[in-house]
Amino acid sequence: MSIENNIIKSLLEIKAIEVRKDKEKWFTWTSGIKSPIYCDNRLTISYPKVRNEIALSFKELIDTNFKDVQVIAGTATAGIPHAAWVSSLMNLPMVYVRNSSKQHGKTNQIEGLITKGSNVVIIEDLISTGKSSINVARCLREHGVNVLGIVAIFSYNLEIAKDAFMQENIKLFSLSNYDELINYMNEINQLNNNENQLLIDWRNGLNNK
């Protein structure tokens, strides 16, 4: 079984992925997008086997694609635990980046020690529109850091995100994605024809806007 399918299998087993057929009960993302599917990767931290599998897969992905990495950065809040586990596996320093600066104390947006010119890989739990991840990358770049790329547990493979990452010249890799999810759910007979078409049409609708 591929890494993608292994991750998807684990996410389904812990019920991190939920599909709702009834349009009136669809999920609402932070961006305002209505979605028949929700991927709650925060649940992975409660399952040692799953989080270890994710950490090892991240390490392999980073070793393969970002050989010059010097620091692992987690996105607040969902990327923080995974960044901690990966940085420990790779024996690398770690930082995490808030959505905005604190309003008290040192008012830091980046927590942890990082120096200008450092090569950083950002760890994110989920990529939808890509907006929050790109904001983190911009923050790091503003502090003189070299962002090698972003790795995520799951990506919806939305065109709006692909375009945004391309415009920012940011490389993105994910351990699993929407297309692989649909394929795997069909393989294990978790989707009927109507559900399969619903998921395809929803994503196509977003990509064609």
From Swiss-Prot:
Gene3D superfamilies from the UniProt entry: 3.40.50.2020
Enzyme class, spelled out: transferase
Pathway assignment: Pyrimidine metabolism; UMP biosynthesis via de novo pathway; UMP from orotate: step 1/2
Record's keyword annotation contains Transferase: yes
SUPFAM superfamilies: PRTase-like
Keyword Lipid biosynthesis part of the UniProt annotation: no
Xref: InterPro entries: OPRT (IPR023031), Or_phspho_trans_dom (IPR004467), PRibTrfase_dom (IPR000836), PRTase-like (IPR029057)
GO molecular function: magnesium ion binding; orotate phosphoribosyltransferase activity
Biological process, per Gene Ontology: 'de novo' UMP biosynthetic process; pyrimidine nucleobase biosynthetic process
Listed EC numbers: 2.4.2.10
Needed cofactors: Mg(2+)
Entry keywords, A to Z: Glycosyltransferase, Magnesium, Pyrimidine biosynthesis, Transferase
Family: Belongs to the purine/pyrimidine phosphoribosyltransferase family. PyrE subfamily.
Subunit: Homodimer.
General function of this protein: Catalyzes the transfer of a ribosyl phosphate group from 5-phosphoribose 1-diphosphate to orotate, leading to the formation of orotidine monophosphate (OMP).
Alphabetical list of NCBIfam families matching this protein: pyrE
Protein name: Orotate phosphoribosyltransferase
Gene source species: Malacoplasma penetrans (strain HF-2) (Mycoplasma penetrans)
